[in-house]
Amino acid sequence: MSIGILGKKLGMSQLFDKDGNAVPVTLIEAGPCRVTQLKTQPLDGYTAIQIGYGVSKDKHLSKPEKGHLLKSGEILLKHLKEYRVEENSSYEIGKEITVTNFEVGQKVDISGKSMGRGFSGYQKRHGFSRGPMSHGSKNHRAPGSTGAGTTPGRIYPGKRMAGRYGGKKITTKGLLVVKIDDQKNLLVVKGSVPGKPGSIVNIKPNNVVGNKGGAKS
């Protein structure tokens, strides 16, 4: 896996291509991140790079956390993320990771927490059809039959029912990078990204089976 970067979703907008077509895009403040730890095969059993993003207040961190973070500099970082790599000799603790690790035209995978919608019913959560709304019907938004019969005499696990909707990790794959502004740490990708504006997202090179390409070191 190539190293990625952490960022903050700013919101959605649109750009116009050379033919005048409106292209929906998501604006992300990507980095800057800092390398906080290098993991090696002899010491940790695998090779990885840990990065940190966002500034945290001193009171929100424990002494062990502050001791770990201060090795990479004087900035106390809020969010940590680890990326497994084949070798990490080109990195050092404290090195800054910026949006320049990506390039226009590259495809990326972006992970984040989806917007939480609370306890939701069948129609909203799963898109079920509703029942009749008139002529004395009492089955407007009810689920209908949920089980079989005497056999098996129970509801199978995994049955789609009402429940908590959203607030889960979602990964959107193959998003195209359409613009980069390294002065503002801005990454613009085509399409939508999980989460609400202000939420933390993880951006990494598109993971294609058999393809070892990715972001530049």
Swiss-Prot record:
One Gene Ontology cellular component: cytosolic large ribosomal subunit
Keyword Ribosomal protein: yes
InterPro entries per UniProt: Ribosomal_uL3, Ribosomal_uL3_bac/org-type, Ribosomal_uL3_CS, Transl_B-barrel_sf
Role this protein plays: One of the primary rRNA binding proteins, it binds directly near the 3'-end of the 23S rRNA, where it nucleates assembly of the 50S subunit.
Organism lineage: Bacteria, Bacillati, Cyanobacteriota, Cyanophyceae, Synechococcales
Region (Disordered): 129-161
Domain of life: Bacteria
Keywords linked to the UniProt accession: Ribonucleoprotein, Ribosomal protein, RNA-binding, rRNA-binding
HAMAP family, sorted: Ribosomal_uL3_B
SUPFAM superfamilies: Translation proteins (SSF50447)
SUBUNIT field: Part of the 50S ribosomal subunit. Forms a cluster with proteins L14 and L19.
Any one of the GO BP annotations: translation
Protein name per UniProt: Large ribosomal subunit protein uL3
Organism: Prochlorococcus marinus subsp. pastoris (strain CCMP1986 / NIES-2087 / MED4)
Gene3D superfamilies to which the protein is assigned, alphabetical: 3.30.160.810, Translation factors
Gene Ontology terms, MF aspect: rRNA binding; structural constituent of ribosome
UniProt record similarity statement: Belongs to the universal ribosomal protein uL3 family.
